[in-house]
Amino acid sequence: QLIDTEEKRREIIQILLTSEIISLDTETTGTEAMDCEMVGMSFSIRENQAFYVPVPCEREEALKIVNEFRPVFENEKSLKVGQNMKYDILVLMNYGIEVKGKLFDTMVAHYIIQPELRHGMDYLAEIYLNYKTIHIDELIGPKGKNQKSMRDLRPEDIFKYACEDADVTLKLKNILEKEFKDKETQDLFYEIEMPLVPVLARMENNGVRIDIEALKQSSQYFTRKMKELEQEIYAMAGEEFNIASPKQVGEVLFDKMKIVEKVKKTKTGQYVTSEDFLVSIKNTHEIVAKILEHRGLKKLLGTYIDALPLLINPKTGKTHTSFNQTVTATGRLSSSNPNLQNIPIRDEDGKEIRKAFIPDEGSLFFSADYSQIELRIIAHLSEDKNMIDAFLSGNDIHAATAAKIYKINISEVT
């Protein structure tokens, strides 16, 4: 149902305010929540029934309409259901709305059940509902310069697609919640994963400041260091060559220098010079370590030093990474655009990059970590008396273990 008048909006708001479960979705002009505008909102409170509320491009009018639904979004008594809810929460944040109450994210629910599979709505609809959804490409066309924006379409063209999103998500929720096999799985979902969603949304919304001048200095530092390495590599090889070319690297290392007897080749007959292979032969000649170091610097330069300034949001002056909750099978978070969890921490090159991240004015960065958390969990689960005693007494667990093994006093362990 298309809700395109103020009177219809008032009616649907009253219905939503009395609903215990609300499936919701936002339609926007892009996939980056911090850079897009809302085109509309869809809601479903029972299967096979949904509503779509268009949101105009004029900012003041858009804020007015979205604000009318504030009591719905901020009603702590209703369960909010969505697919990839972090995105919708972020979009609504940019309109001054905080989503309150318990959450049920179908993407995260399926991740808990089948972490190694895909979790997109189209895939889940096919698997669980035997239903093929309307694909976004059918509305705006395939990716490319000619692709339309959702803003280019009339509400009449969008509302069936948008209503389907909210309806399918509600249907998936009704199936997936029954898939939680035991209380431990339920607790993991409701007590850990779901409360984490708005936390990650706030982290992404806050973003982090970047010191452009520090990056410029780092760029000069990395470029200078790479040139020095190049000269060292050329001197060892006895000739200049393109270090970025796997073909030329292979020819220099294995044809000219013959640093190993057994070489590996690809199906096309080219020498293998992948990072894994070069690491495995690093001790055969100093030039290999130099080439690996050069590659590492080039990667850091391209991934962070040169890329970070381009990822600064012009509206906030910060970079806003995306924290991915449903990627790793182990439950660990990952991040992308940019990947802020993969910056080297122990070497000088990593420190050079990290100094470009700065706190807000009047604030400080605070770094905290659990002390030996894995071993503490092992002690708790195993109820091992020796481990528990070591932790309770404040001793170093490794020193206590060594003392036990060698039957000496812990004070003698060095």
What is each PLM-predicted segment?
Residues 62-77:
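Short, basic/hydrophobic alpha-helical segments
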Residues 67, 123, 351, 375-376, ...:
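Feature representing long, continuous alpha-helical segments
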Residues 87-94, 252, 377:
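Phosphate- and divalent-cation-binding pockets in alpha/beta enzyme and binding domains
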Residues 1-57, 74, 83-85, 100, ...:
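Conserved "right-hand" nucleotidyltransferase catalytic core of DNA-directed polymerases
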Residues 79-89, 113:
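Acidic, metal-coordinating catalytic cores used for nucleic-acid/nucleotide bond scission
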Residues 98-114, 394-398:
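Conserved beta-strand -> loop -> alpha-helix junction used to position metal-binding or nucleic-acid-contacting
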Residues 160-161, 388-395:
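Active-site metal-coordination segments of metallo-dependent hydrolases
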Residues 393-414:
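Generic long, charged, amphipathic alpha-helical segments
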